[in-house]
Structures are given as structure tokens and as C-alpha cells.
């Protein structure tokens, strides 16, 4: 019995020593910050704030403490300096091994940044040095601030600008003080629904912060991963550097072998790696072997050629299987060995229905797009692929004789504003972000359909939808980040035809946004003009698209007014649209000497009551199907009357007995127009309006 008691006593002492030893050797982590660190506004704050979540993620070998204090500033002369708070003194006394600092949000207050910004770097350095003094071996990370969104009451009066300025200072401070930088902005910037007050993240947001910090502290980014774009049958852009990139655990060696050449790189502290090989001409199939200590992967059937993005709304999304040419297309698809398709389709169509809880949550999580695999063309792979994009890619491959990759991420009903990145709208058009569902920027139909879809959401003000500003960029464009493409084929506008001036402003921003995103300031845009349909605003909208394309650099128009259906916005004759897109690309992007667009009016001159219209691209000018139709003229009163028109060489002579002194002429100005002017290439003339030179 005594022996048993003695052994039990020894065992208990051993366990106690082990526990005490474990506690002594635990890595002490201090989370220093403001209300976001503290967990302001969170239910069950002590369990849901990011330091508490970080403790659970790191485990028992770490001792994570929350030293956040709401409302505090980094600036020592700010309205509530962090260094004057009890939490600061407690954090120093903790003598942490690791320090994570997230400060700066409250420095955007007008009491602080305008007056004391010149001291921000100095004060941050003092804070860093204070922790180093307490523990010279301490590792310190400072954080790029979490976002402040547009609904913040001072967003446009200073907060937006000062937040951006402080972020740049934090970059500089990290570099100058040799501390690691944790980006808390990027993983949350596309998630405004997690910030009810535009400033403080909810529990899900706090978890994202904790996961981001945990990866930065430990270097554990979940092992080797690559974008779905890097897969068998992929197409890569010729004459651009051949770049392979992905994520892996920090510090790992990544060895990439491509065409007999081997490159080795070390994964950065943010988990990113990238290897680049010299640009190549078209060719394939090739393969690449990517190896880390934990995993090896071979990607096969890589082709180098031309890569295009086809995007927009439902007429770009419209599948091959529903088009007029479906039977022939499906039967011959396998005869397109050069064509490689990457279909990003919507998992949740915006039909006239109320979405259930699962769908609402997935949409909020930006999990809208499905597919995401490269496929070669065959009957099964093209049937649900965009008909316009398929015929565009097919025509390019037939002409260029090189592999052609087509990425399609079009989603029906989406608005122009939904495809523009958040930063662009915050700085160039912030008013469109405010309560889009109930404002008057969005098309009434689009807003009503969106509200119908999200009707069962517990908080509709925070519920995301594909039609709202920025959503499609965040769900369907960010997955393409840094992937090289040649250009964009864009077919959208039906959901913005209610406000022509607004669309013109938005489309300019979209081009600017995407050119910045793809790192190509001269990224070509091939724009499909709206077709004919009995909607009253469409003639003027078509003309606006014409004028935009003529004015904007590297932008070319594809006319489709001869293909529409008077009653159905989704006309089925999509093959000519894709082929006309290819003509514009071949001529303007690839320098083919061919006719790529229809007659374009360049001048109007009046002689008495006759109007002489002069055209370019007018070789073989003719009227399809009989007499010329679609012209109208107006006098000083601005009232238009139907006009007679006769073709004379490469000109058209227009007149009306009701307009003795014509001052303006227009063409194809009916919503569903039967205007029929074409050239020898059978390409149609666009809807247009022109003042008459006297």
C-alpha cells in the first residue's frame, strides 16, 4: 500500500513539473491594438475576439493575451494615445516573445492625423523599441489596418484619404524597423458584410484576422496550393513571361522544372512564391514539375498561345446548346484541338425567386462561381459554354493557328458597377456604393430582382448580391489576379441602359480598373453593342456605346443591331457575334489586313434639302435585302422625320420632304431597328446621330 502511494505521489509530481515546465516554455504572444483587437461589439467577446481565436488556433504551447483598448491612437499626441493606457503597461510587463501591433484606425480621426501625422513614424518606432527594450529577443509584427468602409460617417471627409496615407506609412515603418508586415486589409476588403458599422468586424471577421495572423506568425499557410488556372490543358499567353505562382509554407523551397530548365525559389513570409521563365512563342503541349518538401505536382498539356477573357452578362453567358447553330457546333466541337476553355459559371442564377439560407451565405462568402477547370473543346464541354465566347475563340484559333485559351466569367443580369473594383469606386464614384438596393443609380429591374433574391436574409443591408457594386469583381475577377491575358471581349449593358450618362461614366472606370488589375495599360477591349429590342432607351444607348468606343483607347465596337429579336433580349443567333469579335481582334490586335467593321459615318453635309453622308469602311456599300432603311433627318426644331436614302458609291444621300433645311441626321434609331446598311464584308453600320455641317 505504501509503495502504491509513493508511486502515485511521484507520478503526480512528475505531471506537475511537466505542466509547470510547459507553462514556462510557452511562447508569449501580445496582441496590441485598439477596438478591433479588443473585440468591440462582439457577442461573447472574450471568446470571439481575434486574440481568443488566435489562442485556440495556436494551441497550448502559446500564451496569447489581448492588450487591445478601444479608441486608442498610435500617435502619442492623439486624442487617446495607446501608450497612456493600462493595457500598454500590462503588455510591456508581460515581456512577450511575440508582439502583434494593429494600430492606426483611430489616427484617421480629424483631431489626430491632420495635426500630428508628421510624428506617426516616430511614435510607431518608439512603440516598437519599447517592446524590444523589455525583451531584446522579441519578434514584432505590425499590421496593415483592417478596412474602413464607405458607410463610415467621415469616409469622404477625410477618413478614406487618411486611412490610405497611414497604410503607406505602415509599409515604410515595417521596412525601416526590420519588422514583419501582416496584411489585415486584403483578406477583409472584399467582405463589407462583416462590418456592420463600417469599422468593426463581426465574429467571422475576427476569425479571418486570427487566421491571417496565425499564418504570419507560424509560417503555416496550409502547404502548397495553386490557383485552379494552373491545371492540365491550361493555356498561357505567348510573348509574356511564363509565370508559375502559388502559396506554400513560409521558408519552404519550391523547385520548378519547365522545358528542362530548373528554377528554385524560397517562399516569402506571406506565403507567396513565384517563378518566371522567359517569354515564348506559341507551342505545346508542355509540362511543368513543381516540388516542395511536402508535395510534388506535375501539370501536363500546357499550351502557349493567346488567352482572352470573355465577360459581361446574359448574352455573353448564353450557352452554345441554346443557340441557333447548336447542332452543328456540338457535332464539330471535337475538331477544335487548339481551343482551351475555362468556364466560370454562376452556381446561383438570379432567377425570380427568394434564395435560401445556404445560397445567401455562399453569396456572402463570394462562393458564386463554379467550374474553374481547363477543358478542351468537345460536345460535352461546349454545350454549357458561352456561344459568343466559343465562336470568338474558334475563329481566332482558325486564323492564328495557335492555341487559344478562352476564360468566360459572364453572369446574367450583372451591372457594370458590379464588375468594378472597390478601390476605384471608393475614390472615383463613392456615392454609388451607398444603399445600392434602394438608391436610384441601379437599374430598377436589377435592384428589384436583387431584393427579391435576398428577401430572406436576416439583415438585407449587409447581404451581398451579384448585381451590387464591386461584387462581380470580388467574386469573379479576383480569382484571375496576375494571370496574363491578351485582351477582353465584353458584352454587357442591358442592366445599365436605363441611364446612358451613368453607364458612360462607369464604363470608363471599368476599363481603367481592369487595365490596372491585369497590369496592361493598353489592354484591348472588344465591346459588343446592344442588339435590337423593343426597349425605348436602346437606340441612344447603342449610340453612346459607339461614341465611347471611338473615343476610348484600345477599344473597338462590335455591332449587333441586325441580329436582335424584337421580343427577346436573348436572341439565339450568337455565331456572328463571336466571329465579328474575332474580326476586330485580328485587325486591331494582330494586325491582319482585313475589314473588321461596318460602314462608319465620318461626315454629313447639306446641299439644299439633301444630306450627303460620307463613310469609311464603305467598300461595296449596300442595303441588305432591298431599299435602304433606317435614316431620319431633323431641322432646326429637332423633330426627326423618316427620310429617303440612296447609295452613291461610298456615300448615302438622304432627304425628307418634311425637312427643307436639315440640321441633323440619325440612323437605326428605332429600339428594334430594321436599318440595313452594310459593306462588302456584310458588316452592319452602327446606330448613329450626326449634326450636319453647313
What are these regions (language model features)?
Residues 324-372:
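N-terminal structural subdomain of ketosynthase/condensing enzymes
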Residues 2, 24, 56, 79-221, ...:
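Alpha-helical cap/lid subdomain in secreted, periplasmic
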Residues 1-25:
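Bacterial Sec-dependent N-terminal signal peptides
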Residues 25-31, 36-125, 300-301, 307-309, ...:
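Conserved SGNH/GDSL esterase-like catalytic core that processes O-acyl groups on lipids
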Residues 269, 317, 328-330, 334-335, ...:
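Catalytic-domain carbohydrate-binding cleft regions of carbohydrate-active enzymes
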Residues 245-326, 391:
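Extended acidic/polar, glycine-enriched regions
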